[in-house]
Amino acid sequence: PGALRGLVQALPEGASEARLACLHRLWDVGSNDRWWAARTALAELETPRMGYDHDAAAVKQWRKRLERAQESEERAWEELSHPTYFSHIARHDLSEFELGEFQAELARCTPIARAWLVRKNLREHPQRRAYLLFVELPGMDDEDRYELCRSLERTLGLPGPVLALWAGESPTLQEIRRSAFEPVFSR
């Protein structure tokens, strides 16, 4: 799947048919890239080009695919963010390099006292790398903690989606210590 995605991105501007063929193959392998494939195919089909006729059937097919892929992505996010945070988790799977980069990112975020990272095994996308990040943020009010967690979700360079949660009412610091393995970062 990664090679097909790279090929689609590397094909020249005029290679619309080849790009669409690769996107069909990417969709057919049932990969985690279906949402991307559908959006890219629709962008390709909806871009007016000299010498190409509008293919209404293909646009309709890719719109349906995009809708299915979006529903799948929503189910995956619901599963990741469901309050049974500690079910279907495993130790993080980051390489030493990835972990070092991640720890450097956390070190730049001064409010974080400690952090735990676990991999969440998603039933919707079992091959996808998805993570839960639990952070201890002493001395902050809940509104600021919430904003910081959303910011971490957008900016951290993890190889998959991440849901950031602070130690508090749910989950509690005790639950995190008991279930999230050892901290990956400590100040």
Cite the ranges covered by each PLM segment.
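Alpha-helical junction/boundary sensor with strong preference for TPR arrays
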Residues: 11-14, 29-34, 46-49
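A contiguous, surface-oriented mixed alpha/beta subdomain in the mid-to-C-terminal portion of proteins
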Residues: 3, 70-168
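Extended alpha-helical scaffolding segments
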Residues: 21, 35-43, 132-134, 140-145
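"A position-specific structural signal for the A-helix of alpha-solenoid helical repeats
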Residues: 2-6, 39-44
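Alpha-helical adaptor scaffolds
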Residues: 1-16, 22-28
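Alpha-helical repeat scaffolds
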Residues: 17-28, 53-66
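Short, low-order "capping/linker" segments at domain edges
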Residues: 171-187
